[in-house]
Design a protein with these regions (language model features):
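Catalytic alpha-helical scaffold of carbohydrate-active enzymes acting on polysaccharides/glycoconjugates
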Residues: 1-143, 148-215
Length: 216
């Protein structure tokens, strides 16, 4: 969210994750819930040196340069103790050690699949980098949540190539169809908000059979 938020106006929310994850794991254990935590590969790094070593060599050349996190790497601290805003290695270890949940991919560092300037190949490199650092931590990644719900059907073949066999899509309505930053508008956001309370677009639940038939 760094292109839209700052530590000054959003930092409290980020630090809140340090409390939220343990609380969620405790509740999941209590009620027998199994969850998927889709995580950027960035957060698998234990320190900045490891992070830099794992970054994909090929990076997206977004038309809007502010979308690229690499322009702000000088602001990243050394490790989680030094910079809890950018690192969360201990939280991932808590999820992993719980043994009841899946850790999925959110790409390496919030890859935006509908923004101008990026390509299928840079997307593939982001997924491979995320898979590699996850594997170094003993985790096999099989699922993906597209950052900002920028679902791009043309990229599903890339997902298959790197071992992703399931993904979170968007509800079948124009309100939820993937859009890039410039194509999003307040009207759609307002209708999505209203849909939360008024069910404007119908139910979006699916049977197990439907889900299984849609796997990559």
């Amino acid at each position: 969210v760094r292109d839209k938020r700052t530590i000054e106006n959003y930092g409290t929310n980020i630090l809140g994750v340090q409390l939220a994850i343990p609380a969620m794991l405790s509740l999941f254990d209590k009620y027998g819930v199994k969850g998927t935590f889709s995580t950027v590969g960035f957060l698998f790094a234990n320190n900045k040196e490891e992070l830099l070593a794992c970054c994909p060599e090929m990076k997206p050349q977004y038309t809007e340069e502010n979308l690229s996190p690499y322009n702000s790497f000088d602001d990243v601290g050394h490790n989680e103790q030094d910079d809890p805003y950018h690192f969360g290695y201990s939280l991932l270890q808590q999820i992993k050690e719980n043994n009841n949940h899946e850790i999925g991919s959110h790409t390496f560092c919030h890859y935006y699949c509908l923004e101008p300037g990026q390509t299928p190949e840079t997307f593939r490199q982001y997924l491979l980098a995320a898979n590699k650092i996850a594997a170094a931590n003993g985790i096999v990644v099989r699922s993906l949540v597209f950052p900002r719900n920028q679902f791009n059907e043309e990229y599903l073949s890339v997902c298959r190539e790197v071992g992703i066999d399931s993904y979170r899509g968007n509800p079948a309505s124009w309100l939820y169809a993937g859009r890039n930053k410039n194509d999003e508008n307040l009207l759609r956001r307002a209708f999505r908000f209203a849909d939360t309370y008024l069910n404007l677009t119908g139910h979006h639940c699916h049977t197990k059979e439907y889900v299984m038939s849609s796997l990559l």
